[in-house]
Swiss-Prot record:
Tetramer; as part of a THO-DDX39B complex. Component of the THO subcomplex, which is composed of THOC1, THOC2, THOC3, THOC5, THOC6 and THOC7. Component of the transcription/export (TREX) complex at least composed of ALYREF/THOC4, DDX39B, SARNP/CIP29, CHTOP and the THO subcomplex; in the complex interacts with THOC1, THOC2 and THOC5; forms a coiled-coil dimer with THOC5; together with THOC5 and THOC6, plays a key structural role in the oligomerization of the THO-DDX39B complex. TREX seems to have a dynamic structure involving ATP-dependent remodeling. Interacts with NIF3L1. It holds the Pfam family THOC7. The modification N-acetylglycine is found at residue 2. The modification N6-acetyllysine is found at residue 36. This is THO complex subunit 7 homolog. The gene is Thoc7. Residues 182-204 are annotated as: Disordered. Belongs to the THOC7 family. Ubiquitously expressed. Residues 50-137 are annotated as: Interaction with THOC5.
Amino acid sequence: MGAVTDDEVIRKRLLIDGDGAGDDRRINLLVKSFIKWCNSGSQEEGYSQYQRMLSTLSQCEFSMGKTLLVYDMNLREMENYEKIYKEIECSIAGAHEKIAECKKQILQAKRIRKNRQEYDALAKVIQHHPDRHETLKELEALGKELEHLSHIKESVEDKLELRRKQFHVLLSTIHELQQTLENDDKLSEVDEAQESTMEADPKP
């Protein structure tokens, strides 16, 4: 067991004494001794009562000193309790701050984890696509092919326009030829009619 402190000894004595309950008894005893001392009939009896009063006064002084010590001890304990209370409050406030900081760190860690997952998913998607250099090459080749096809288209359109014009000229020629043939047929019919008329008329 550890050493017993003075405060513990005083506390035990207070418990035994009934927390100062004997002071009233001592005061009553002091008053009775004082009355007996005043009414003493002999010097010996007066001296005896005087010694009792001194003893009772010493006990009262000791009790008062003990009470003051207990009071000071209680004040020190109250100050100590207030100090401990403030330390506990500071510890609680510090714990709340640490909890808030931990929550922020957890949220930040969640965001970092989410960003990392999104980055990994995007990286997988990018890996399935061709390389940028190869894509540029393909785009360049497609551009050249498109340019070549554009030239071919222009050439085909030019040829088609030429054929359209030639067909138009051919149709015009055929139309003129038909007109000519029709005119020739009409002339032949007129000539035949004239010849028939001449053959039908007799010479005089």
